[in-house]
Amino acid sequence: MDQCDVLVIGGGPAGSTVSSLLSEKGWKVVLLEKDNYPRFHIGESLLPMSLPILDRLGVRDKVEKIGMIKRGAEFVSQYHNGSSATYYFKGARNKNHPY
């Protein structure tokens, strides 16, 4: 492709998503990524509120098979003897997700 309407740099979750959605709308999109995916990277996880967009893109099953489901968050404090607090998404106010 010699020309494009949109050049997206970075094929992580955000870059891949915006590229797919713009392409659906008819834009000529070029996505550039230097790394191979999937790869381990802090912050890449399957958060419950991302499920609707993954469903819309038709990739939820593939992403779930990678195994990055995030069921909650744990906070550890070096200032409190290494104590931690864990919060699970299933205890959140919004119950429209499976975990």
Which residue ranges define each predicted feature?
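N-terminal FAD cofactor-binding segment of flavoenzymes
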Residues: 39-80
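Beta1/beta-strand and adjacent pyrophosphate-binding region of the FAD-binding site
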Residues: 1-12, 30
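N-terminal Rossmann-fold NAD(P) dinucleotide-binding loop
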Residues: 15-16
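Short amphipathic alpha-helical segments, especially helix-boundary/capping motifs
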Residues: 24-31, 48-49, 83-90
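Glycine-rich FAD pyrophosphate-binding loop
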Residues: 7, 23-42
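A structure-centric signal for secondary-structure junctions around beta-strands
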Residues: 3, 26, 70-72
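Conserved N-terminal helical subregion
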Residues: 1-3, 77-99
